[in-house]
Amino acid sequence: MGEEHKPLLDASGVDPREEDKTATAILRRKKKDNMLLVDDAINDDNSVIAINSNTMDKLELFRGDTVLVKGKKRKDTVLIVLIDDELEDGACRINRVVRNNLRIRLGDLVTIHPCPDIKYATRISVLPIADTIEGITGNLFDVFLKPYFVEAYRPVRKGDHFVVRGGMRQVEFKVVDVEPEEYAVVAQDTIIHWEGEPINREDEENNMNEVGYDDIGGCRKQMAQIREMVELPLRHPQLFKAIGIKPPRGVLMYGPPGTGKTLMARAVANETGAFFFLINGPEVMSKMAGESESNLRKAFEEAEKNAPAIIFIDEIDSIAPKRDKTNGEVERRVVSQLLTLMDGMKARSNVVVIAATNRPNSIDPALRRFGRFDREVDIGIPDATGRLEVLRIHTKNMKLADDVDLEALAAETHGYVGADIASLCSEAAMQQIREKMDLIDLDEDEIDAEVLDSLGVTMDNFRFALGNSNPSALRETVVESVNVTWDDVGGLDEIKEELKETVEYPVLHPDQYTKFGLSPSKGVLFYGPPGTGKTLLAKAVATEVSANFISVKGPELLSMWYGESESNIRDIFDKARAAAPTVVFLDELDSIAKARGGSLGDAGGASDRVVNQLLTEMDGMNAKKNVFVIGATNRPDQIDPAILRPGRLDQLIYVPLPDENARLSILNAQLRKTPLEPGLELTAIAKATQGFSGADLLYIVQRAAKYAIKDSIEAHRQHEAEKEVKVEGEDVEMTDEGAKAEQEPEVDPVPYITKEHFAEAMKTAKRSVSDAELRRYEAYSQQMKASRGQFSNFNFNDAPLGTTATDNANSNNSAPSGAGAAFGSNAEEDDDLYS
């Protein structure tokens, strides 16, 4: 009676907060006593594994026992156990050669199993690796093999390598064959066969470099999903039988190119030991009637014969397009054949079909139902943690300098997929080689060992590579590698601060937004007179956040073809989401986002459709994706009001003409790398240029520099002419004094920009924004402030119950008269839209 019933937190009885843990449960290895951490060996014997006495007692082993040691990628070998009490519990020592045989590194885990019933070998076959016997004469058996096997008890495993030292040399051998079984101990009467063609190391290394789970980074959750659906049915089909369901038949992997879809399928095949049958989509197709379907049937038959098997169809969209959209009869027949083959697979035939594509929506929908491709796994662009994993994988065999910070690189490579990171590492290594090119003699056959030892990829090499690469998802969109910092933007301090809050905070402090349960604002509109630095501000924002920067020039998006303009906008936002965090900068926004309703004369209302598409894209920006839209215009009155509502471009920032201090700041920013005449006061220019925009000031600076360059070139020419006249006029004696005069450094006639140059430049300077235009901008800005400042005096205690927001608005709304018509638009008529 008193029994307390606890309500289930979920239909499955699992606390929903534990969901993430179960999603990757298959990746967690269960820690057992016989799993040992690998340390480096002290004595370099190829046949031993050393563990301490406690571990030996726990595993019920004795010194000298033969054990089976399992590593990665289904590799194992047989070794003899020795005691080393300097080791900690749960650790073991294995030498480098054995580690290579097991495909493991220091710090990895191996499992140990007793192997008491190992037999003696009747015959083993060994062959040397070619590059280790160069220059050796004499009998390999007498010098190397006989002492190695006669002097010690040696268990061997087919396929293993071992290194033998003899005299001053060491030779590497491979066990090619063992009789009667794969594992055996070499005894006194074992026949050792060693004659044959030496093995080429390149061929061996290709076999050793098979892809495994360790070679895949950045998609931990997806890896867990695929292993659940592929590895479990292949290795333990009884699990599904016991629970009474059919195992999955097919998995469809989709995602941008370069994320590792093909690599993942190969890794699963290598680690499970399944037969791997690769079908490259286009290779199946044939012009002969019936041959394409026949090729598919053969692939499935071959896989069923060699079960457990994985059939991997790469680029499946090329052989299974939507049947109602294709004109070719062959494609339709191939799709139908694939459907019947997948339906015809026996329930527990131990064959799994994996397909990969980067265009999942162009595949025939009949393939995407349960029983065919049951599961769809989105292998997306990795986040910073994923990128760090991928960087570690690609740099594990690279020689890195001490200053390389992989975490910083991972943080800076937004939008990079695995293939981009591989390319980045390769480019950084090439840059290191280029830097050492002076020390390398290309004509020599061999490169000096000192030069090879001095190679090491530095952080500067990675920075260089970063500057020369961009994410492959954005290759066709012009992604500008922007190098504009806040220092390049003079003045506008308040606006800079506001921008930092809008764009930097969500990227650098996402935890704060989570804490307050809000999603950050994603849109900003700069408006103001031409030349005030709106575009420059957007570039500086992208650099400071180290986000990708997509610059969209309004008129470029418009196309004469029906629907093409909207499609261009969709593509840009899709790419921005793929490479997030991204700043999408819409320059001259008024050209593509004009107020709707007035575009009847253009291409069937193309402008209206573009605005509609832009609105839906801004609303559809996924909350998890950091995509910021910055618009810039100098005609804010022409922009559709729906774009300016909160949730879209909700922060309207007026970029005014600079005041005197801002003008001085702009001049300093523009001239910070330019030599100026000592004592030249820029304040005089700043004071004189009332009403000038940043672009107007840049014109003055460029004009002054132009005059300085002109004077410098003319002075140089005059100096050269004088020298020639001097040489022709008198025969100069080459005395010591003459030689000294020759060597004297030439004095630069124009070393800096002078006051005269600026005075000359000021004569042609002019304002680009008239007073009348400026008044219109100021009035519009005041109108926007007034419309958004209705409740500036709001106080919780002051608002009595029963008063409506409208009452408060009416009492506070004091927009300046005429402000609504600032740009010639009639605000009174607009307000009466629904009357």
Swiss-Prot record:
Effect of E315A: Moderate reduction in growth rate
Alphabetical UniProt keywords: ATP-binding, Cell cycle, Chaperone, Cytoplasm, Endoplasmic reticulum, Hydrolase, Isopeptide bond, Microsome, Nucleotide-binding, Phosphoprotein, Protein transport, Repeat, Transport, Ubl conjugation
Crosslinked positions (Glycyl lysine isopeptide (Lys-Gly) (interchain with G-Cter in ubiquitin)): K305, K322, K346, K522, K539, K594, K673
Effect of K261A: Moderate reduction in growth rate
InterPro entries: AAA+_ATPase (IPR003593), AAA_ATPase_CDC48 (IPR005938), AAA_ATPase_domain (IPR050168), AAA_lid_3 (IPR041569), Asp_de-COase-like_dom_sf (IPR009010), ATPase_AAA_core (IPR003959), ATPase_AAA_CS (IPR003960), Cdc48_dom2 (IPR004201)
Result after altering E315Q: Severe loss of catalytic activity and cooperativity between the 2 ATP-binding regions. Lethal. Restores cell growth
Binding-site residues, ATP 2: G531, T532, G533, K534, T535, L536
Stated consequence of mutating R475H: Restores cell growth
Modified-residue entries (Phosphothreonine), positions: T735
EC number: 3.6.4.6
Binding locations of ATP 1: P257, G258, T259, G260, K261, T262, L263, N358, H394
Chain intervals with Basic and acidic residues compositional bias: 720-729
UniProt-listed SUPFAM superfamilies: ADC-like, Cdc48 domain 2-like, P-loop containing nucleoside triphosphate hydrolases
Catalytic activity reported: ATP + H2O = ADP + phosphate + H(+)
A GO cellular-component term linked to this record: mating projection tip
GO BP field: ATP metabolic process; autophagosome maturation; cytoplasm protein quality control by the ubiquitin-proteasome system; DNA replication termination; endoplasmic reticulum membrane fusion; endosome to plasma membrane protein transport; ERAD pathway; macroautophagy
Activity regulation summary: The first ATP-binding region has low ATPase activity. The second ATP-binding region is responsible for ATPase activity. ATP binding to the first ATP-binding region induces intrinsic activity of the second ATP-binding region. While ATP binding to the first ATP-binding region appears to prevent ATP hydrolysis by the second ATP-binding region, ADP-binding to first region promotes the coordinate and cooperative ATPase cycle of the second ATP-binding region.
Start and end residues of each stretch annotated as Disordered: 1-21, 720-746, 792-835
Compartment(s) where it occurs, according to its Swiss-Prot or TrEMBL record: Microsome; Endoplasmic reticulum; Cytoplasm
Superkingdom classification of source: Eukaryota
Free-text function comment from the UniProt entry: ATP-dependent chaperone which probably uses the energy provided by ATP hydrolysis to generate mechanical force to unfold substrate proteins, disassemble protein complexes, and disaggregate protein aggregates. By recruiting and promoting the degradation of ubiquitinated proteins, plays a role in the ubiquitin fusion degradation (UFD) pathway. Has a role in the endoplasmic reticulum-associated degradation (ERAD) pathway which mediates the cytoplasmic elimination of misfolded proteins exported from the ER.
The protein's name in its UniProt record: Cell division control protein 48
Organism: Saccharomyces cerevisiae (strain ATCC 204508 / S288c) (Baker's yeast)
